[in-house]
């Protein structure tokens, strides 16, 4: 179970977010063209500063600090992505510029104009992804999928991609890398899944577009690869989960890309259809224990964040609210294992809920054991042979001790109920 740790207000509408691979750092791209980088507090520090007397965590160790903020693009910033070591932050905007910046300072180190092979007009980007230290993928409104070789500085500076493919007839809405094969020598992905319009496609770094699915007759919006699923009948252990525009997740067997194999209803929506599933991320393995199987986190068009079990008994296992109106357009997990959801003009940080009740029960059981030892320890056989009057006296004493424990338990519960979800203090906000 997750609980909301804090809410981070933004100066304008969120279009995209990216999480640093090794540090608790969040970068956001806004409709105003700004890119802003925040440092989140360490999970341990935030937990230590919570107490029952206040709902505001305001100590210096638990603030969200602005590392830097800049107007990076004219128009909106549509997409962001870190490279594999987190040293470089790539951004692309409706000005059709792709920029690389030092992630620690925000200083631009290189920029290119995204080409449009069909017309002389600008071709705004939709997604970017650093597939490996050598390859950057960029998709555009014109359905193009550009591959930039980062080892060839002259190509990157001139804005000419090493390869361009057209896997779909509509703009590319999601991009998910497939894991490298056992025969891979580099350890990096060379194939990836894309969705665009009503189709799914697989593209290879060396061979281009390998396969394109049948028309699904429903809009495909988000996707993520999930491995380690339980094998069941004809279904394998590796699948791609695809979020649709009608509130349904479709499951696709790896290697069987012509059509979907299973469906999970996330939002029924009645006759009008369900809410769109705009963003999706696989849940880290260390957080899956409480949900009984492999799960994905989905950002929905109604402002909810839903955890969906895709292995075993499938279905929604938790429903959280990010916003009452605005859609959730981005979800991800930071290096501390916290869930970050973004939509509208806010970002929310969610942390796995600590089961305080279980801890209290363990403490009470330990108190019972100690109390019983006190009663039995002094008398031995002689205590058991006392007359009935002594037994009645011990019973009365035991009732008083039990009453004391119940009072202590009530006090603990009272204190627990005073704890609220904190709103962190923010530094460097404009």
UniProtKB/Swiss-Prot annotation:
Family statement drawn from the similarity comment of this UniProt entry: Belongs to the WD repeat WDR55 family.
Gene it is expressed from: jip5
Transmembrane portions of the chain: none
Residue spans of the WD repeats: 9-48, 72-111, 117-158, 215-262, 272-318, 323-360
Biased composition (Acidic residues): 356-374
Keyword vocabulary terms for this entry: Nucleus, Repeat, WD repeat
Gene Ontology cellular-component terms listed: nucleolus
Cysteines engaged in disulfide bonds, as pairs: none
Protein name per Swiss-Prot or TrEMBL: WD repeat-containing protein jip5
Compositional bias of kind Basic and acidic residues: 382-397
Biased composition (Basic residues): 405-416
Keyword Nucleus found: yes
Origin superkingdom: Eukaryota
Location of region: Disordered: 356-430
SUPFAM superfamilies referenced in this protein's UniProt entry, alphabetically: WD40 repeat-like (SSF50978)
Subcellular location, record wording: Nucleus, Nucleolus
Classification lineage: Eukaryota, Fungi, Dikarya, Ascomycota, Pezizomycotina
């Amino acid at each position: 179970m997750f609980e909301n740790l804090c809410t981070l207000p933004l100066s304008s509408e969120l279009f995209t977010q990216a999480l640093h691979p090794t540090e608790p750092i969040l970068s956001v791209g806004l409709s105003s063209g700004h890119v802003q980088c925040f440092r989140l507090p360490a999970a341990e520090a935030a937990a230590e500063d919570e107490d029952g007397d206040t709902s505001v965590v305001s100590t210096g160790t638990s603030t969200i600090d602005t590392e830097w903020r800049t107007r990076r693009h004219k128009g909106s910033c549509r997409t962001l992505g870190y490279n594999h070591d987190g040293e470089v932050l790539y951004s692309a905007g409706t000005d059709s510029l792709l920029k690389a910046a030092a992630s620690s300072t925000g200083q631009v180190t290189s920029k290119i104009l995204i080409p449009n092979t069909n017309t002389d007009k600008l071709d705004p980007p939709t997604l970017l992804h650093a597939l490996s230290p050598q390859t950057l993928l960029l998709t555009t409104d014109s359905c193009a999928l550009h591959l930039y070789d980062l080892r060839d500085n002259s190509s990157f500076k001139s804005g000419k991609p090493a390869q361009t493919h057209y896997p779909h007839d509509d703009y590319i809405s999601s991009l998910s890398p497939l894991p490298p094969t056992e025969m891979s020598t580099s350890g990096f992905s060379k194939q990836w899944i894309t969705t665009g319009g009503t189709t799914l496609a697989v593209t290879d770094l060396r061979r281009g577009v390998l396969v394109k699915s049948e028309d699904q007759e429903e809009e495909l919006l988000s996707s993520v690869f999930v491995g380690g699923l339980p094998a069941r009948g004809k279904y394998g252990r590796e699948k791609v989960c695809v979020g649709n525009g009608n509130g349904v997740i479709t499951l696709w067997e790896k290697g069987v890309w012509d059509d979907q194999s299973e469906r999970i209803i996330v939002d029924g929506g009645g006759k009008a259809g369900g809410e769109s599933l705009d963003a999706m991320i696989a849940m880290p393995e260390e957080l899956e224990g409480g949900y009984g199987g492999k799960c994905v986190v989905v950002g929905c068009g109604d402002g909810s964040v839903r955890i969906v079990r895709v292995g075993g008994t499938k279905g929604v296992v938790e429903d959280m609210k990010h916003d009452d109106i605005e859609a959730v357009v981005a979800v991800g997990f930071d290096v501390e294992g916290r869930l970050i959801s973004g939509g509208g003009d806010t970002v929310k940080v969610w942390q796995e809920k600590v089961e305080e009740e279980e801890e209290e029960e363990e403490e009470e059981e330990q108190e019972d054991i100690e109390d019983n030892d006190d009663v039995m320890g002094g008398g031995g056989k002689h205590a058991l042979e006392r007359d009935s009057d002594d037994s009645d006296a011990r019973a009365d004493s035991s009732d008083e001790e039990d009453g004391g424990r119940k009072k202590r338990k009530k006090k603990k519960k009272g204190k627990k109920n005073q704890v609220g979800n904190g709103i962190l203090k923010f530094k460097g906000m404009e």
